Amino acid sequence: MPELPDVVVYIEALTRHIVGQRLERLNLLSPFVLRSVDPPIDSINGQVVGGVRRVGKRIVLTFDADLFLVIHLMIAGRLRWREPKQKLGIGPKLILASFEFPTGTLFFTEASSKKRASIQLVRGEEALRGLDPGGVEPLDASLEQFHEALTRENHTLKRALTDPHLFSGIGNAYSDEILHAAKLSPLKLTRSLSDEEFLRLYDATRATLRIWIDLLRKDVKGGFPEKVTAFRGEMAVHGRFKQPCPVCGSPVQRIVYAENECNYCAKCQTSGRLLADRSLSRLLKDDWPKRLDD
């Protein structure tokens, strides 16, 4: 799922490509993509895009008459820009919608059969706020705001960082990277942090997100993002199970749950203790190793 750094870079690219341009036509190519009825979606045809902004992990195009088009990429949704006569390069069945502009077409695609990605058209700031889960902006939050959000509930750090009602835009991938940078266990409870650990987490959150925004900007080179993925070779732990930690060389570990996995370095983050993986620990029972050197 595209997270805060990915969405920031998407918004910067969209600003360069479509702000100030007239939307000639919006084509809905999937019956599942539109999740709103009123205002009618064709009311933005012929209107000029006034701006692009972010609401959590959502991308918002602003139009006259207080209209906001909200694009939620979810896990497999992506945006692709193509100039006239330029080939799209993917199968037509993956296209959810297309936005035709004088200088090119913006394609909204989803490489999944679950059809979670969506478009909504709402009118007014109040309706737009209703789509905002309300988490604090991690790059803008003060120490006090960050602390209040983190300790509102006594959750694990992994759960708290990825809760959109607490923190805006952080998901599975960057939470792994943040916790590795902070040298904190993903299962440590939020209200158990010492002052020093809290400061490490606050600094690591801001630094990690800024580093990745800069890296993604360099990849785009002023163009449009084409390879938006949660798994990148430069990442320290996310998606790197059994590969060496770039800090200590120990193999990266994982916890598998639902449709996700949490990656961490046992030596850097849990003092060598292996965190229980539900599926494997149930299978191995007493043979499940407790520490990295077992």
Where are these regions (language model features)?
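Basic, nucleic-acid-binding surfaces and adjacent catalytic neighborhoods in DNA/RNA-processing proteins
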Residues: 22-40, 53, 58, 79, ...
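Acidic, proline/glycine-enriched N-terminal capping motif
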Residues: 1-130, 267-275, 279-294
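Phosphate/anion-contacting hairpin/loop surfaces
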Residues: 63, 69-184, 189-192, 196, ...
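Residue-level marker of intrinsically disordered, low-complexity segments enriched
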Residues: 5, 68, 117, 134, ...
